[in-house]
């Protein structure tokens, strides 16, 4: 039978759904785990039985989908990914091929060139799109993927150098607009979480750094 696992945060309408494109043979809740969870925490496991003829192979795809709004939205995303993941993967490959062509370099040191290409890819992984704020560059994976005023003053210079002026300008715009909402006095925020909560309204350096960052992006 199918086993679609659903989980919801007790205090918020945050939902996650996960499963696979094959029937599960065994599933169990509250299984032992090596991961230390905060609060009450929940765990689940599923077992899949696969029979392979000699010299054959089989692909098993797992899907994780979530929503900050409802279980229905999470389930819709889950079904969409399950049905179209092959096409989505090809689209993603094409996207990253185009990304590597942006700000492309060709140097004798191919190892350094590979590092440069991975820097562009890693930077793209930090791009976030918040409905309530806009698109911006996060600070760093995995601990601090949200918005920082100080960090971006430095990061955006590298972003422009690798050819992504659009994301650099979008990030500056989000910092400016969210700082205005939080401070209303020209002070630039230090940190904003993904729920648009400004947890730190800014130190002395963020405002000066922001002015310099604007100059470096638009000069």
Question: Which positions does each model-derived feature cover?
Answer:
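Aromatic-rich carbohydrate-recognition surfaces in CAZymes
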Residues: 50-52, 58, 145-219
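Acidic/polar, glycine-enriched structural segments that form the non-catalytic walls/loops
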Residues: 1-145
């Amino acid at each position: 039978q199918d086993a679609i696992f659903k989980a919801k945060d007790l205090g918020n309408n945050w939902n996650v759904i996960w499963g696979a494109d094959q029937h599960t043979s065994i599933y169990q809740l509250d299984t032992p785990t090596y991961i230390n969870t905060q609060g009450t925490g929940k765990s689940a496991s599923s077992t899949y039985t696969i029979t392979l003829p000699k010299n054959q192979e089989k692909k098993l795809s797992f899907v994780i989908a979530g929503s900050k709004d409802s279980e229905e939205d999470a389930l819709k995303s889950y079904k969409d990914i399950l049905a179209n993941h092959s096409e989505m993967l090809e689209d993603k490959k094409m996207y990253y091929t185009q990304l590597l062509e942006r700000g492309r370099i060709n140097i004798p040191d191919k190892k350094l060139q590979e590092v440069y290409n991975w820097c562009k890819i890693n930077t793209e992984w930090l791009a976030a799109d918040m409905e309530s704020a806009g698109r911006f560059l996060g600070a760093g994976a995995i601990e601090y993927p949200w918005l920082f005023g100080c960090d971006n003053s430095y990061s955006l210079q590298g972003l422009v150098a690798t050819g992504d002026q659009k994301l650099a300008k979008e990030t500056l715009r989000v910092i400016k607009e969210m700082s205005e909402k939080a401070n209303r006095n020209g002070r630039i925020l230090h940190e904003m979480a993904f729920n648009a909560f400004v947890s730190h309204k800014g130190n002395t350096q963020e405002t000066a750094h922001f002015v310099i960052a604007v100059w470096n992006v638009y000069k």
